[in-house]
Amino acid sequence: MEVIYEDNHIIIVNKQSGEIVQGDKTGDRPLSDFVKDYLKEKYHKPGAVFLGVTHRLDRPVAGLVIFARTSKALARLNKMFAEGQVHKTYWAITQLPPQSPAGQGGNTGQGGTVTHWLTRNEQQNKSYAHDHEVPGAKKAMLHYTVIGHSNR
């Protein structure tokens, strides 16, 4: 576990792809448990350690997660997220450049929009993206800008 920032109110951790932030039906040990263990050991805390989950990242996503170390910090961060005061930025590394319907969108500075319809299968604990409208699905739009290329 990599701690990026820590003070008396929050702790920011670099979540790896494949980890879950909070417990779910899979029974896999969540990142929040590892952070609690870290805090308990570092500060020699007896008993339970408070740790508030302020937001989540999906299992396949790597990135920074902010946890609250106090209930007051959790309330403030929840309010900030609810009021849109927190701006999230996602960077994706793809094998091939994205293609817009006109065949553009792969050059640096260019971009586009990808639209999918999302469905969830609770029994499989999986979500699916469809490239066409599906009854009961939630429409999801992703606006992107290409920021670089690699020779790889």
Language-model-detected regions and their locations in the chain:
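RNA pseudouridine synthases
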Residues: 1-152
